[in-house]
């Protein structure tokens, strides 16, 4: 971070990436004005356990005063914004690289995080990230404020809202 040895800050803001497991300690200590959550993914089961456990640990640590910026394409991440004013959602439109069928080895979101009914997916970006809905309780992908409207991984760029082109250092989503 940008601070002197005595702890005096040199900047008014910081961008910090945190491991999911550490958020229970970090969030209450930092009181972030804005919290961005990109995904909850079964990448570190040995450290963090099931994504629902990770969700619960993060949920109880989020301040009511923080503005949330959430990935609408992740059903569990979107749940952080349920019944919360001022949440900003981002995601991706249906892309040419998407699949209509599940192709991953495991699926973290077979069941709705609200009512536990089987989730319906209209498209998968990867694993459980995509466009989803629950026919039992009505939980579904939120409308987005910002969307990836085009992704060309061979050329190495994405477009946001068909207006802003971003060249990718890594040709991957």
Which ranges hold each PLM region?
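Walker A (P-loop) phosphate-binding motif
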Residues: 1-3, 63
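Active-site nucleotide-sugar/metal-binding loop of Leloir-type enzymes
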Residues: 6
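Flexible active-site lid/hinge loop adjacent to a nucleotide/diphosphate
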Residues: 9-122
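Adenine nucleotide phosphate-binding catalytic loops in nucleotide-utilizing enzymes
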Residues: 91-173
């Amino acid at each position: 971070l940008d601070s002197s040895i005595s702890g005096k800050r040199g900047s008014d803001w910081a961008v910090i990436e945190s491991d999911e497991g550490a958020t229970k300690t970090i969030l209450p200590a930092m009181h972030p004005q804005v919290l961005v959550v990109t995904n909850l993914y079964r990448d570190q089961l040995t450290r963090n356990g099931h994504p629902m456990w990770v969700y619960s640990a993060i949920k109880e640590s989020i301040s009511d005063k923080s503005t949330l910026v959430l990935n609408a394409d992740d059903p569990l991440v979107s749940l952080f914004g349920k019944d919360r004013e001022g949440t900003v959602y981002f995601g991706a439109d249906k892309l040419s690289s998407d699949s209509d069928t599940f192709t991953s080895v495991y699926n973290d979101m077979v069941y709705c995080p609200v009512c536990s009914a089987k989730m319906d997916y209209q498209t998968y970006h990867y694993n459980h990230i995509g466009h989803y809905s629950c026919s039992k309780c009505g939980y579904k992908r939120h409308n987005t404020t910002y969307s990836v409207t085009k992704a060309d991984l061979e050329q190495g760029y994405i477009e946001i809202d068909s207006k802003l082109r971003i060249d990718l250092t890594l040709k991957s989503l």
